[in-house]
Amino acid sequence: MKKFIKELSDKILDGYVINEEEAFKIINIEENDEDTIEVLLQYSNDIRKKFAGNKADLCSIMNGKSGRCSEDCKYCAQSAHYNTNVCEYALINYEDVLERAKEVQAQGIHRFSLVTSGRGIESDEELESLIKIYSGLKRDTNLKLCASHGIINYDQAMRLKESGISMYHHNVETSERYYGDICTTHTYEDRVNTINDIKEAGLDLCCGGILGLGEKREDRVKMAFEIRGLGVKSVPLNVLNPIKGTPLGENPLLVPNEILKTMALFRFVIPDSYIRYAGGRIALGDKQHKGFSGGVNAALTGNYLTTVGSNVDNDKDMITCSGLEI
């Protein structure tokens, strides 16, 4: 297997595009095969160096509207379908957003995104409020601005772009085949339609998914290739943090090597992208640093939407100790 990984890596470094059959061989490396996974991480890092350079990208998010979501995503604390005791509030005011954005900027983080619960932007009034917030952030900070507001259309994407947004975040979450098992109130196609509208509007796209939803290894491979087919260059990979009260609240955590192996696989499939640590990476325990020396070159840092996240200074130390620049 080590010989296969080396030969495949050498081919990718020469411009070869990996196929699904080869990816299945990688994803099926046993999680307790430490030596082979170490080799995989080493070659994943070589691919990152050649195609994505040595600069790491840091982003941070703020929960701009919480709870009462109409959608039934089985992993989500903010769905109104489940009793999770999540804090609920309407869209927050600009002063609170600006205060958080300035904290993020002072920490040396590159990107900042407001994230709101709900199927999408729920009214023209909400859109106008968001535009005022982003226009203000564009004026009052030097941050690169991102947005994450669910399913939107082309016109809404254009308005957000005009207000100062450069990137929109919209995950596929899992493979097309498995999507109906985690959400029934909208479809995988709905998500892809939003992604296409975002791209047509000229916004950069941040699109990844969640590992540990009960999917098969095959679904992780399928998701990687589906994301590659969408032309994505920023791929946030979350690890399920089971939330009590949701249908997936008792799901077992993925073991660290399964997570690291999957992130390395995404580097093999999409060599020139930002592979981004996102929520739930606490499941890696003391192996978090291995991702940064195994192909990961971006991170969502600080707190997440409804869970405690990572320490910014610790993330910076891990990144620089892995040979990446911030």
What are these regions (language model features)?
Residues 1-71:
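Flexible, acidic/Gly-rich N-terminal and inter-domain linker regions that tether
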Residues 127-132, 187-189, 220-224, 254-259:
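Charged helix-capping and loop-helix junction motifs
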Residues 1-32, 228-326:
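Auxiliary Fe-S-binding modules of radical SAM enzymes
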Residues 153-161, 214-226, 282-294:
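Catalytic cores of alpha/beta
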Residues 39-82, 89-113:
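N-terminal pre-triad scaffold of radical SAM enzymes
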Residues 15, 44, 73, 170, ...:
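Conserved, mostly hydrophobic/aromatic
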Residues 81-100, 104-195, 204-208, 233-238:
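Core AdoMet radical
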Residues 112, 119-122, 194-218, 237-252, ...:
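Conserved strand-turn element in the central/C-terminal portion of the radical SAM core barrel
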